[in-house]
Amino acid sequence: MKKILLSALLLIGGIAMCPALTREGLTEYKLDNGLTVLLWEDHEAPDVTGYIAVRAGAVDEPAEYTGLAHYLEHMLFKGTQKIGALDWEKEKPIYDSIIDLYDKYSESTDPKVREQLATQINECSMRQAKVSSLLDFFVLHDMIGAEGVNAFTSYDMTCYLNTFPASEMYRWLNVFSERLINPVFRTFQAELENVFEEYNMYANDPSSQVQEQLQKDVFKGCPYERDIIGTPEHLKNPRLSKLIEFFNTWYVPNNMALVIVGDFDAEKAKPMIQETFSRLQPKELPARSTYPEVSFAGNPTKHYNLGYNPQIAWIYQGVKKGHPDEKALDFVCALLTNGQIGLLDKLNTKGDVSAAYAYSDARRFTGRIMIEAIPYYDANQQMFESDKATKAIVMKEIEKIKNGDIDDALIANVKRLYAQSYKTAEENTRYKVNALVSSFIYNEPIDDIFTDNEYYQNLTKEEIVRVAKKYFDAPYMTISFDEDTKTPKAKTLPKPNIKPVEPSNEETEYCKAFRKLPSEEYKKTFNNFNDVEISSIGSNVTLRYTPNKKNDVFTLTLRYGIGAHEMPLLPYAAALMSNAGIMGSPATEGKDFKQQMAELGADVSYGCDDSYFYISISGEDGNMNKIMNLVNRQLLMPYLEQKQLDQVKGSVFFQRLSRQKRATVQKSALLQYALYGKNSDYLDEVPFADIWGLGLPKVQSLLAEARSYALDVFYCGSLSKDKLVAELPLTEGMKSAKPLYIKDMQKYDKPTVLFLPNSNAQQADIYFYINGRPYDIASDVQSGAFNQYMSGGFAGVVMYEIREKRSMAYTAYGIDRKGALPGKDCYFYGYVGTQSDKVNDAINVYMDILTDLPKDSSNIDAIRIQLKQSAQTAKPSMRGKASTFEHWQRLGYKEDPAKTNANAIDAVSFSDIEKFYNENIKGKPVTIVLTGDPKKIDLKAIEKKLGCKVTKISNAKIFKSTQELYDAVM
């Protein structure tokens, strides 16, 4: 379930922008066939984002065929009777046979008969592949420089999306409309295996299991109780005819929207849209089902041993999308959780709980109010606080809401947070896309995008109290989870016995015609480093100043030239400072400090990496003086309660204690060990005894020391440079910054296999690592071309060989990674996530790729276009310009990399890719880093393939001993 904080509300439909944002550039209309068209010009966007939004998702599936919506999303990348068709007349009877065979397969319960039918389906699929081009759809997108070709399925919608240059508007509209006309669901059997892989990827993740169980209980009796991906039983019993039926029912123009946002001309686009999308034929939609509300009468409770740590959820009845109380209920939940000053946020700030938050989850048919908490962990007692005690703490705040005991200042400050969020939403192209999509999916007026903020600002306390009482003074369900110490295996889907398809991949007639379709001249625009004014404003103090002409919200980052490498305890001081108050002031407690900042429309956070200490501040320029006053006082006289210190220490204690049982952390630690050896983040970490001894005096001295080093100021706002400098906390005699710390990579001069056995893992993780050259920008274009050839989406060699042909994995890639600075090591980094019983096959195929790269020069034009488009759209946001330009300059660029590399991109050839491969990959020793179920992996076969012994790695090798934790607290 979504955990929605106010900062994330910009991505949720029904939330408004500031009144200053107008309809300028926005066009909405319908074609005669009922297709909704939503166009929003944004000429500061680097490209164009295009969506097809379908008002159908997992809730619209028949109960006996779950997973259809998600599986259909996968299949709509497989082409049509034109896209991907080499000879449709020959292909059609084979396709019809596959549909018929799947019907028989679904109806049969005899294992032998089903096995025979599966073999026949596989044989037909291989025959169909010979008369089709599996990659056609992706090659077409590569031709136009489309990026981020993707889709997603939720309960209420399915969306297909990517970005593309405006010069390719006509061809993009052509292929995006064509994909919806007579689609052909090729390689259905193989793609089902990819869905199996996706299912298995989450099946043994305890966190995913917790969320799945919540869904089942919270939405009992409604399709929302089902997992979007479908049940194992239904996934094992597919029926292609039902997929076709689902498409024919819901994928009709009167149930879809075309959403285009970005740097384009809407008037030019309209006739193109008419020509391409008016081809879709409308149909009458079936009546949607309705579902009775679940009763929480009697305050039912449920308990499960599931997950990594205790967790409690209290669930109230909410409202569905479009309900008259929806917006007011959102606001009430923001009074509890907004990331800064909510009633539950204060519990987090004080250290009373490990985490607590609330949100309203409104959906098409129903809604829920979710209150969730993780209890406080006491490192002294080495246990979590009881559910009963945690409930008392959380429900005390809920009682305030329920009883209307809501402070006027809190209401005013939350309104201020909303208003400021909507101001900055104007800068966000993604917000515009999501707002339009949500408006369509939930039949909300487009005008709400522009008027909702006015609604929130005019919301009265009486209305807030009415809604709070109505929904919180009601029965609720309690669901609690305790850590599952047994780690039970979830149901996973078996490896089928199918042969890989061998598509022809000749060029189709549609592809040939597509090449000739008109496109406009590619518009080259480049970033100008002079957009950021750089000046020295003191000894070892540099200002990077970016003017903000859009609104009065500033962002200010103070970056000091020392980090965790030199001061290992600094990250913990930073974590504590984010919740600190000011000693001896009205803002003594952290919650009071946050309240004062909120009254100024401001926020501050602290962070640290290996090389730098950061203070990040945002707020309204008109309040800069007061904001900086508060921040300076907090830095000079921080106040921390003992429980805040204990909460951070307890969090670190539990994380280190439990991480050896977490598969995601295990694989991260194994990879860190392979890449950095003893300098792994999990081995070269602060002794817990040092953290345990951390107190307020030490925090103060750490801050004072960090702030004595060179300062880089990154500002984006509307103040003049002189006014800004007058407000900055500048001191004399700042020391030179410490050198940037970049870890050295491990060197492997022979093939190596590092294996961490995990008998509980169905999902295996395979990493491939090859030491590379010292980094220099001169190799960027060749490296980029190689990466595009290897992992440029589904048409890349790795995805094509591993997933598209053989269905071995849901995720697979291989790229050349740049060194962090000139002279630092580059390296090849590859990955395959697959079932343990497919590991040997996946390693064999991947090693064959690395040993002898498949050669296909036919796509070099598309690779060139992709490189050009990627370079052209690497345009940072207004607030990101300063840091991005600095990064490019550190790498060695004196201007926009797109400009420097333009000629090299135009001239790149397939021989450049071959040369890069020969110099950096071919014949180099490969290190494989592997974790999975040892009973399902043939280690001897891996040794034979690599020509080396497999080195088994234990947790003791990649983690520090937990004994240091107990020694510290004794």
Annotated model-derived regions:
Residues M1-T22:
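Bacterial Sec-dependent N-terminal signal peptides
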Residues A20-L39, D265-Y304, Q311, Q317, ...:
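Proteolytic maturation boundary segments
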